[in-house]
């Protein structure tokens, strides 16, 4: 059995044990400690922390998430870090309410209820929890779906909320040769069973926050944002909200009627579909459509974006462009929450 070591987290005064054969983030999940995280693959930097004392070694990771100079200074990514002595680690990014009060990670057996195309490459997958009969999560989080017959998984965000405890919806982008998404072309059938593990992620509305919410999404990034909007509608949240969804053409838009209906229950809601290639074609309902990249459309409308909380979710080029725009407009980093589909576990 692997040796264990103690980890002390500063400045929150939390102690836990970690085995040498598990990374620190997984050890925290196992013990009910919910550290800030994103991709869990060493690519997004959400779990970046600073080693004050002790010996830590990292598995492979992206230098975009933690560059060589930072590593030399003592910065690590907890999702890739293994401890080989007792350690003291300074958390750079944490939510004190979440640390010991997050939803426990669950292993759930589910049954496929529906596989429904939404666009040419986005599919709605609806699963019913059967053992246990309920899956707890917060709006905006994601889960691992295990690929049938393998030890592999892919991660997808939930589009639903806890009000639909009998069903969990995922919006999945199909990729040629994708190990999970390719199964949605007739291989996964209604009645099949799929194992699910989660929830993960910090892409959630923060209790007690009052700033207006600006959501910027693209592709399957619709899922967690739709979950947030459904939650805001159900709870009669009083925060103003705007949603900018980037797509190429009208044929790439979906769930428009529901978004408009949700907006009726959200204070000062606005939805704009941003089309980068062509606005020619019919767009149902009273949807506002503007041509251009989603960041350009946001720039035209959000002249005081530094006084908002921004939620980003979509393909890496869109998220990277949005982060550059937000940085140029002096939006504080603690007011920006994002999921960027940077890892194979997200995008196939």
From Swiss-Prot:
Entry keywords, A to Z: 2Fe-2S, FAD, Flavoprotein, Iron, Iron-sulfur, Metal-binding, Oxidoreductase
Sequence positions that bind [2Fe-2S] cluster: 39, 44, 47, 79
Bound cofactor: record note: Binds 1 2Fe-2S cluster.
Residue ranges of every copy of the FAD-binding FR-type domain listed in the record: 105-206
2Fe-2S ferredoxin-type domain sequence ranges: 5-95
Record Pfam families: FAD_binding_6, Fer2, NAD_binding_1
Induction entry: By acetone. Transcriptionally activated by MimR.
Cofactor entry: FAD; [2Fe-2S] cluster
Assigned EC number: 1.18.1.-
Disulfide bonds: none
Keyword Acyltransferase attributed: no
Transmembrane segments annotated in the record for this chain: none
Keyword ATP-binding on entry: no
InterPro entries: 2Fe-2S_ferredoxin-like_sf, 2Fe-2S_ferredoxin-type, 2Fe2S_fd_BS, Beta-grasp_dom_sf, Cbr1-like_FAD-bd_dom, FAD-bd_FR_type, Flavoprot_Pyr_Nucl_cyt_Rdtase, FNR_nucleotide-bd
MF GO annotations: 2 iron, 2 sulfur cluster binding; metal ion binding; oxidoreductase activity
Matching PANTHER family: NADH OXIDOREDUCTASE HCR, PROTEIN RFBI
Complex formation: The propane 2-monooxygenase multicomponent enzyme system is composed of an electron transfer component and a monooxygenase component interacting with the effector protein MimD. The electron transfer component is composed of a reductase (MimB), and the monooxygenase component is formed by a large subunit (MimA) and a small subunit (MimC).
Family, per entry: Belongs to the bacterial ring-hydroxylating dioxygenase ferredoxin reductase family.
Function comment: Reductase component of the propane 2-monooxygenase multicomponent enzyme system which is involved in the degradation of propane via the O2-dependent hydroxylation of propane. Reductase catalyzes the transfer of electrons from NADH or NADPH to monooxygenase.
Protein name: Propane 2-monooxygenase, reductase component
Source organism of this protein record: Mycolicibacterium smegmatis (strain ATCC 700084 / mc(2)155) (Mycobacterium smegmatis)
Encoding gene (name): mimB
